[in-house]
Amino acid sequence: MSIFRTIAMFIYLFGYMIVHYGVLRRAERALAAGDMQLVEELVNKHIPHWSRGILKVTGVFLSVEGLENIPKDTACVFVGNHRSYYDIPLLLASLDKPHGILAKEELEKIPLLNRWMKLLGCVFVQRDDLRASVRALNDATAIVESGKSFVIFPEGTRYKGEEGGAGEFKAGAFRIAVKTGAPVVPVAITGARALFENNAVSYTHLTLPT
């Protein structure tokens, strides 16, 4: 990833979380008190704003196709290809509201970010531990059963091959859909890999089912 884009992304990422630390604490207190309406209100306001801000300050222009095809009034399992670290803010900036994500355990160790991710409903997974992976999938299944949509990158890691390709899909995302009966919404992200290779203004595209 270009050094300038990396610096800009991390300055904005942590700068936003520090400036809005009071919002984080308010959301955590609401969660502890069982006020889920307030938690969702704060998360739905700030996480998309944070995601769009990252794209703006790093010179990323996003086009989205197919939002009208997302099933309404039901929890979905969003299944996307994984090309770069930008995939998460790209998705969070595109959907009508943010959703929990099956994320690698390393992200749980990042201060402030881990707390926002927990409020969002993210589930952290140890990819090299089968039992822990099963527990994580069960947790994600419970979230979908509760009526909330969830995002999974079924390759399990970023795909580093040619643009247009994809890694081997793991079965976890589809098991969640089968167990819950939730519709699977495929998401194709193109152009995200290029964000790692230059400092120029870049375009990326996100396609939902047609």
Where are these regions (language model features)?
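Conserved small/polar residues in nucleotide/adenosyl-binding loops
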Residues: T204-T210
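Conserved Motif II region of HX4D acyltransferases
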Residues: T74-F78, N138-V185, L206
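Short glycine-rich, acidic/polar surface loops and turns
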Residues: A140, A173, A192-S202
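Short, solvent-exposed loop/turn segments at secondary-structure boundaries
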Residues: D128, E162-G167, N199-A200
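A hydrophobic membrane-anchoring feature enriched in long, contiguous, low-charge segments
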Residues: I3-R29
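Glycine-rich helix-loop-beta junction characteristic of Rossmann-like nucleotide cofactor-binding loops
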Residues: L67-I70
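Short gly/ser/thr-rich secondary-structure transition/capping motifs
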Residues: V57-E65, S133-V134, T190-A194
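Catalytic core of membrane glycerolipid acyltransferases/transacylases, capturing the structured
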Residues: H20-A33, E40-N44, K56-T58, K72-L130
